[in-house]
Amino acid sequence: VLAAEHGPRGVRVNALLPGGTDTPAATFKTPESRTFVENLHALKRVAQPEEIARSALYLASDASSFTTGTALFADGGVSINRT
């Protein structure tokens, strides 16, 4: 809705959906809990903050000048993983 409303004025509206990311807020109590979260991702690891930042920079850059009304999944495949 926001993309449709603001698009005519050249405003792009997108969402960034990150997967598990290795940050201080993502505390893993045990190695097993980290492994569990990693295994939720198709890539079998969590992201580094820089990887999510690059996705955000893409959305904010001219490289995405024709991208609006979309969600960018930077989730390591957690949204498609079936294990």
Model-identified regions with their sequence ranges:
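Alpha-helical segment proximal to the catalytic Tyr-Lys
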Residues: 4-5, 65
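A glycine/serine/threonine-rich, flexible loop-to-helix segment
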Residues: 8, 18-40, 51, 81-83
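Short C-terminal tail/terminal secondary-structure segment
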Residues: 57, 68-83
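Conserved SDR Rossmann-fold cofactor-binding beta-strand/turn motif
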Residues: 12-22, 60-63, 73-75
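Active-site loop of short-chain dehydrogenase/reductase
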Residues: 8-11, 70
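A conserved structural motif in NAD(P)-dependent oxidoreductases
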Residues: 41-52, 63
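Conserved active-site helix of classical SDR/Rossmann-fold NAD(P)-dependent CH-OH oxidoreductases
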Residues: 4, 11, 53-54
